[in-house]
């Protein structure tokens, strides 16, 4: 694990070096989805682009990340799930990192001026929604003071990174993802009773391997 006294500098260096990549993501991926991604490693040309922000902040002597539970929305394929702040790329965004910063501002009230972006993780294609997700990693420069956007965010979660490094929190379950649709044997992180699975779990899997 990266040493605390130089955490930011070491993390920036590791993000600039070759990343753990897809295999690290696959360790927390649903088996059928992983098989699909292995068979078709290149996303379709018409895939949409989205970006998310893994926002780190220091609290009570430990490093934490920021997750949100999305509101229930029948038009959203990821309705009610736990995820990073993030959303779809818009032409006005320009650089991809601006998407992650904009969405963090809109969803949890964090000003882009309060975020130091350290780098990015491996992009990840989500077949069910046809999005290529670009994960960015940043650190909050000010004190944690988050405000959720009630139209999109039901709850804000700030788990310590230790919740993801603890092997006891890596579990498997069956998930009802839609009416009449149940996924069997889905790996997930149990974070204080919240199920963190899918793309978010895969991104965190690579991030935790990066930390070592």
Regions from the PLM with identified roles:
Residues 1-83, 88-106, 110-134, 139-143, ...:
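N-terminal leader/linker segments that precede catalytic domains of diphosphate-processing enzymes
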Residues 148-190:
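NUDIX/MutT-family hydrolases
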């Amino acid at each position: 694990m990266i040493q605390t006294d130089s955490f930011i500098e070491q993390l920036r260096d590791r993000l600039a070096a070759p990343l753990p990549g897809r295999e690290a993501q696959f360790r927390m991926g649903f088996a059928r989805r992983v098989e699909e991604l292995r068979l078709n490693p290149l996303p379709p040309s018409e895939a949409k682009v989205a970006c998310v922000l893994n926002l780190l902040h220091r609290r009570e002597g430990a490093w934490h990340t920021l997750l949100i539970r999305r509101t229930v929305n029948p038009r959203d394929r990821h309705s009610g799930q736990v995820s990073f702040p993030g959303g779809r790329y818009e032409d006005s965004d320009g650089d991809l990192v601006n998407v992650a910063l904009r969405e963090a501002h809109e969803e949890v009230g964090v000003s882009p001026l309060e975020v130091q972006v350290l780098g990015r993780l491996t992009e990840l294609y989500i077949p069910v929604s046809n999005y290529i997700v670009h994960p960015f990693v940043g650190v909050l420069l000010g004190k944690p003071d988050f405000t959720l956007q009630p139209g999109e965010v039901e709850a804000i979660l700030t788990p310590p990174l230790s919740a993801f490094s603890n092997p006891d929190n890596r579990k498997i379950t069956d998930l009802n993802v839609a009416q009449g649709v149940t996924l069997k044997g889905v790996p997930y992180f149990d974070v204080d009773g919240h199920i963190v699975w899918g793309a978010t779990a895969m991104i965190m899997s690579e991030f935790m391997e990066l930390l070592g």
